[in-house]
C-alpha cells in the first residue's frame, strides 16, 4: 500500500505491507506525485508513476527506487497519466502541458507467453485529479 501525505512537506510517500506495517518512507522533492500503478513491461511487476519530471519523477519500484527515469528531452512536465494506448496490455505514459502532448512507450517488443498480465485497475470513466488508485494482479490466457 503506497500513500502520499503533505503533513510537514509536500509529497512524502509511505509504503506499507498488507498488515499496515510501514516498510519505508521517502520525501520527494517535487510538488506532489500521482502515485499511479503502471504495468510497464507486462512482467507482473507493477511500477509507480511519480511525475513526468526529469529531475524528480519517473517510474518507481516497490523498494522506492526510480527504475525508469524520464529522459531530459524537452518533454512537457505539467501533467501525466497512465493509459494502454497501443493495445498490448502494457501501459504507456502520456505527458502534456498547454502546448504539447507526448507519449512514452516501451522500447522492447512484448514477450511471448501463454499468459498475459492484465491487472485490475481503477476504471478510466471514474478518473479524477483526486482519486485513490488500486491495482490487483490478474493473469489471463493469451
Specify the residue positions occupied by each region the protein language model found:
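Beta-propeller-forming repeat regions
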Residues: 1-142
Amino acid at each position: 500500500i503506497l500513500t502520499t501525505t503533505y503533513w510537514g512537506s509536500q509529497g512524502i510517500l509511505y509504503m506499507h505491507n498488507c498488515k499496515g506495517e510501514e516498510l519505508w518512507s521517502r520525501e520527494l522533492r517535487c510538488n506532489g506525485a500521482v502515485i499511479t500503478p503502471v504495468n510497464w513491461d507486462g512482467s507482473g511487476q507493477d511500477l509507480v508513476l511519480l511525475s513526468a519530471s526529469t529531475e524528480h519523477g519517473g517510474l518507481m519500484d516497490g523498494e522506492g527506487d526510480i527504475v525508469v527515469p524520464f529522459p531530459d528531452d524537452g518533454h512537457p512536465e505539467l501533467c501525466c497519466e497512465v493509459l494502454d494506448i497501443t493495445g498490448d496490455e502494457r501501459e504507456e505514459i502520456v505527458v502534456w502541458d498547454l502546448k504539447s502532448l507526448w507519449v512514452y512507450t516501451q522500447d522492447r517488443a512484448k514477450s511471448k507467453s501463454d499468459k498475459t498480465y492484465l491487472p485490475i485497475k481503477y476504471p478510466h470513466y471514474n478518473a479524477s485529479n483526486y482519486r485513490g488508485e488500486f491495482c490487483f494482479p490478474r493473469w489471463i490466457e493469451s
